[in-house]
């Protein structure tokens, strides 16, 4: 990165449009209507906690509402303009300013870029949150609104949360906060109590697939777009990450190996490990590990009696039932937790990723073969 380049943004997914640049929000009409009704009633709450799984449009909705408020300023102006949704035309000056990140009445808080270390800081720091003091203390421009968007609150530590709590406790006039949280239960109860919670739900697979188009640099065919949408479990962000990381092919390779448990094809295992763990393949690594975790979650749900999801590889459903019965549910939950710990420790210690992949499949092989081993010893 050159010195003249803008700093990377932790709330941007790859090369895809940032939520502030996104004009269309699919599948969240109920949440959008709730915000519109609150504003038009003249009783707009000063702080909103937008919750739900990652990648379903929470930040996109926050910026969409911010543009609407900055464009109209008051319910009377919005009503006179005939507003029936939160849409702001892309050629409107407010849209262009917000998209460029240059609107003076919006403050975006996220994990900052550490220029010295050339990476994002691990938390949304207290210094970032304290920027709200000066921002909300200044005079607002046209419309009189000042809007803070926190993406994501999950990244805050205790000090950051306490700094946010102070501004939420004494909100300035015509101030709005949109607090994006994927796991709101981890936030301080006092923060949650000062916000109005707006719960957003995963999108339908068809809505996710509709976003996987040329505008997001997705070149997959219709069947593959729908498969990625289903794998994403209703998250546009995850679907785009799966596309960027070659996730559909990775998932098929992973499942092909898993279907052979309790035996492993060592040659194919090493091919998969090389693909995921090669230097510079960060997207493939993240996507592959996430998809393996998803598969284990589905295995546990299958063992608990939940209906199986649509299969992406022929015979996947039957194989998952067989494996769920090959060991106790507790053993599968235990190995899932151990794999999560192994990956976290490997990232912290910069362990050889190929060794991590081989160890993961060795653990799975051991659990899948435990039932057969018990029968043999009996």
What are these regions (language model features)?
Residues 126, 158-159, 189:
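Conserved D-loop-proximal element of ABC-family nucleotide-binding domains
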């Amino acid at each position: 990165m050159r010195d003249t380049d803008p700093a990377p943004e932790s709330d941007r997914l790859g090369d895809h449009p940032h939520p502030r640049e996104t004009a269309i929000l699919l599948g969240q009409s109920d949440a959008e209507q709730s915000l519109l009704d609150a504003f038009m009633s003249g009783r707009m709450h000063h702080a909103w906690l937008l919750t739900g799984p990652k990648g379903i449009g929470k930040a996109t909705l926050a910026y969409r509402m911010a543009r609407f408020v900055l464009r109209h300023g008051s319910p009377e102006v919005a009503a006179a303009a005939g507003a029936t949704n939160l849409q702001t035309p892309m050629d409107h000056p407010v849209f262009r300013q917000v998209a460029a990140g240059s609107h003076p009445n919006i403050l975006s808080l996220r994990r900052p870029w550490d220029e010295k270390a050339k990476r994002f800081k691990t938390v949304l720091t207290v210094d970032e949150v304290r920027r709200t003091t000066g921002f909300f203390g200044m005079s607002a421009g046209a419309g009189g609104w000042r809007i803070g968007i926190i993406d994501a609150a999950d990244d805050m530590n205790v000090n950051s949360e306490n700094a946010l709590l102070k501004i939420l406790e004494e909100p300035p006039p015509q101030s709005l906060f949109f607090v994006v949280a994927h796991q709101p239960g981890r936030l301080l109860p006092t923060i949650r109590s000062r916000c109005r919670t707006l719960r957003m739900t995963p999108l339908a697979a068809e809505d996710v697939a509709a976003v996987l188009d040329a505008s997001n640099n997705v070149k997959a065919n219709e069947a593959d777009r729908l498969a990625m949408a289903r794998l994403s479990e209703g998250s546009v962000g995850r679907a785009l990450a799966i596309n960027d990381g070659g996730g559909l092919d990775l998932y098929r390779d992973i499942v092909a190996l898993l279907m052979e448990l309790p035996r492993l094809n060592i040659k194919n295992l090493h091919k998969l490990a090389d693909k995921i763990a090669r230097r510079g393949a960060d997207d493939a690594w993240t996507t592959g590990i996430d998809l393996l975790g998803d598969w284990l979650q589905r295995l546990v749900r299958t063992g608990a009696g939940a209906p199986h999801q649509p299969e992406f590889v022929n015979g996947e459903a039957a194989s998952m039932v067989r494996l769920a019965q090959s060991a106790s549910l507790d053993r599968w939950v235990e190995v899932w937790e151990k794999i999560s710990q192994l990956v976290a420790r490997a990232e912290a210690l910069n362990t050889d990723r190929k060794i991590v992949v081989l160890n993961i499949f060795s653990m799975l092989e051991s659990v899948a073969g435990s039932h057969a081993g018990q029968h043999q010893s009996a």
